């Protein structure tokens, strides 16, 4: 067996893990980001050592990237222990900040909370959405290289037919995150005719076409290992993004934007009916001749082409979520309601997932069936609600510390009925320049470039190193170095105020 065949076999025929285990791992970054914000606030009270570019990068890397690497590798069986450490650290930092509060020092906790609920937020940008997209990007970047090493648990790898693996979440999470900030949600193409809107949508696809074709040519030219049942012979992630964007652009021309959830449910349900009552499922699994043929364009790429329908449903659900979250709100209490509503919706979807998996069909990444779509949306909503709740706690910490500033977090604007002296301090915080020393902002700014860098460096590592026989310490060092390099490049570009766009 050749090295290529060994690597392909190493990532194939996996059955995944439980939905609960994946959900546990997904919510941990929200806690880590909260701890990072609390540490920055406390450091502003104690010293200024965290306010230079090098130190801030290391802090962000330690709180955002390192926990992801360890959760997907050596601490995969100790996620609850990581939660315990993060909760203790976060609670300790919050308690210390509260004890050192410079505002409302003599006021009881209940009164402080009452005043906090009256605070307004400068909500032009929602930090939780930026963090959501960055967490998904970082998770994907770690996983695509880690999966080739023995220290990566096989249960986290992409499943072969049925089941839920941590890596199965990646594409769906990316599509959902992109949908939340799509031009339609941001009303970017509101001016002009429908034809103008469609033209702009099509024009925005050419970088993805370039990347998709480029990846296909590169993979075939170097004879790189491939997981055939993931997308097919020629298809890849970029082609899925193109197809989803094309279909959803047409759908949003026909259907009202605020009824995207109806479209999402309809597509997912009809697609599942087609899988159950037509030869569509047999076509995906066994090809047109029933023997797994890869002859012809459809047979060669049947998984990638047909699963697009499921991802379209996920995208439409993301559009509806984006419309809800990006709706203008002024008070912190409104955002508490939003976070709770999203959390309850996620719980409802997880209950629906259980019912569907028991009575209809188990989740399948390969087909992107109804259960898979529900799982992706529920997982995205649980992560988003965790990040929103973390932002609210961080806002409380900023509320009690005069002139506290944390990059990629809400700016506070006090309500007119509040204490005048504290009003001045919070308005100053709202008007001061946002610190640029932030890895999260940097990754969100050049997300596509970060993903491209991760793919290229993953290929270089695989071509130059025998990943299958790498020891755990060596693999862990390589993974952290790989992520450190990619993050540093993106961070330096951000410090130089450069956004790399191909369109």
Swiss-Prot record:
Question: What's a BP term from Gene Ontology annotated to this protein?
Answer: GPI anchor biosynthetic process
Alphabetically sorted, this entry's keywords are: Acyltransferase, Endoplasmic reticulum, Glycoprotein, GPI-anchor biosynthesis, Membrane, Phosphoprotein, Transferase, Transmembrane, Transmembrane helix
UniProt-recorded Gene Ontology molecular function terms: glucosaminyl-phosphatidylinositol O-acyltransferase activity
InterPro entries documented for this protein: PIGW/GWT1
Pathway membership: Glycolipid biosynthesis; glycosylphosphatidylinositol-anchor biosynthesis
Mapped to this chain, the residue ranges on the Cytoplasmic side of the membrane are 43-56, 99-131, 182-201, 258-259, 326-337, 391-447, 494-503
What family is reported? Belongs to the PIGW family.
* Free-text function comment from the UniProt entry: Acyltransferase that catalyzes the acyl transfer from an acyl-CoA at the 2-OH position of the inositol ring of glucosaminyl phosphatidylinositol (GlcN-PI) to generate glucosaminyl acyl phosphatidylinositol (GlcN-(acyl)PI) and participates in the fourth step of GPI-anchor biosynthesis. Required for the transport of GPI-anchored proteins to the plasma membrane. Acetylation during GPI-anchor biosynthesis is not essential for the subsequent mannosylation and is usually removed soon after the attachment of GPIs to proteins.
* Name listed for the protein in its UniProt record: Glucosaminyl-phosphatidylinositol-acyltransferase PIGW
């Amino acid at each position: 067996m050749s090295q290529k065949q060994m690597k392909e076999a190493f990532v194939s025929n996996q059955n995944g893990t439980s939905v609960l285990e994946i959900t546990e791992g997904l919510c941990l970054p929200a806690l880590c980001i909260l701890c990072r914000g609390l540490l920055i606030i406390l450091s502003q009270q104690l010293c200024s050592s965290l306010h230079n570019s090098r130190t801030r990068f290391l802090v962000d890397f330690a709180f955002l990237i390192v926990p992801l690497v360890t959760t997907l590798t050596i601490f995969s069986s100790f996620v609850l222990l990581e939660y315990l450490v993060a909760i203790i650290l976060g609670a300790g930092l919050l308690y210390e900040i509260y004890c050192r509060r410079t505002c409302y020092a003599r006021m009881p906790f209940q009164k402080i909370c009452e005043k906090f609920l009256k605070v307004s937020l400068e909500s032009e940008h929602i930090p939780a959405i930026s963090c959501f997209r960055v967490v998904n990007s970082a998770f994907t970047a770690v996983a695509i290289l880690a999966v080739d090493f023995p220290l990566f648990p096989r249960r986290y790898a992409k499943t072969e037919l049925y089941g839920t693996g941590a890596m199965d979440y990646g594409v769906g999470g990316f599509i959902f995150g992109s949908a939340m900030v799509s031009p339609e949600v941001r009303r970017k193409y509101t001016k002009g005719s429908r034809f103008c809107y469609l033209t702009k949508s099509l024009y925005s696809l050419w970088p993805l076409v370039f990347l998709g074709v480029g990846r296909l040519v590169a993979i075939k030219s170097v004879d790189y290992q491939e997981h055939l049942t993931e997308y097919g012979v020629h298809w890849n992630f970029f082609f899925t993004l193109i197809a989803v964007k094309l279909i959803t652009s047409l759908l949003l021309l026909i259907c009202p934007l605020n009824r995207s959830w109806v479209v999402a449910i309809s597509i997912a349900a009809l697609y599942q009916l087609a899988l159950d009552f037509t030869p569509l499922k047999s076509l995906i699994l066994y090809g047109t001749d029933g023997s797994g043929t890869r002859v012809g364009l459809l047979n060669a790429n049947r998984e990638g082409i047909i699963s697009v329908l499921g991802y379209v449903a996920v995208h439409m659900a993301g559009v509806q979520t984006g419309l809800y979250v990006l709706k203008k709100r002024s008070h912190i209490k409104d955002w508490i309601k939003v976070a709770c509503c999203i959390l309850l919706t996620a719980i409802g979807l997880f209950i629906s997932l259980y019912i569907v998996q028991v009575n209809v069909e188990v989740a399948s990444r390969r087909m992107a069936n109804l259960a898979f779509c529900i799982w992706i949306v529920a997982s995205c909503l649980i992560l988003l609600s965790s990040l929103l709740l973390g932002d609210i706690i961080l806002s409380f910490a900023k509320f009690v510390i005069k002139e506290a500033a944390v990059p990629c977090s809400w700016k506070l604007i006090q309500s007119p009925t509040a204490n005048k002296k504290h009003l001045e301090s919070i308005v100053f915080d709202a008007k001061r320049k946002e610190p640029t020393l932030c890895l999260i902002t940097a990754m969100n700014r050049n997300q596509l470039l970060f993903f491209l860098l991760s793919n290229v460096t993953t290929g270089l590592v695989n071509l130059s190193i025998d990943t299958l026989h790498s020891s755990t310490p060596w693999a862990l060092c390589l993974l952290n170095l790989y992520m450190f390099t990619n993050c540093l490049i993106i961070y330096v570009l951000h410090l130089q105020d450069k956004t790399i766009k191909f369109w």
